[in-house]
């Protein structure tokens, strides 16, 4: 779909922002950057695991708070590790919009996979997002979401409830196998 938009009126053609380096997000960036002769922005991967696109090397390394400006608006890079150690969301103040990549998705909870993912960082990053003034979430998967504070609060509570179930089971059982713990954490 993206390739078909190249050259159309709908294609922003001055830079590519990569939210993180999982294989469903960054591999096409190099191709598009070369085809359009534009730079990529993102963060290098910190952990080598099977989910990562190790070939991604951004032209510009992002840091929290970096502003990326166009003639019409600025995007603020918001560092949100958790789903991936190099994950960024992008805040567009004039549109009251937070582009969340895989940090918040519509229709499912986010996978936090070891060794690159961190539930502690994920929850901290969700709290950070609550400090921004926006009324729409643009996820990397699924439709736009409204009521962002309600959505974020629900995700945090849901994650903490899952954790509490696991801890309760661990405290009340002499033995529980890993598969049963995983099943319990997904309910």
Language-model features: locations:
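Single conserved hydrophobic/aromatic residue that forms the stacking wall/gate
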Residues: 1-7, 12
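Metallo-beta-lactamase
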Residues: 14-24, 74-172, 178
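Metal-dependent catalytic neighborhoods of phosphoester/phosphodiester hydrolases
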Residues: 27-36, 52-53
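Short acidic, hydrophobic short linear motifs in intrinsically disordered regions
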Residues: 175-187
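A short helix->loop->beta-strand "cap" motif at the edges of active sites that frequently abuts
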Residues: 36-39, 134
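Short acidic-hydrophobic, aromatic-tinged amphipathic segments that line or gate anion-handling sites
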Residues: 60-63
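Short internal beta-strands
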Residues: 16, 39-45
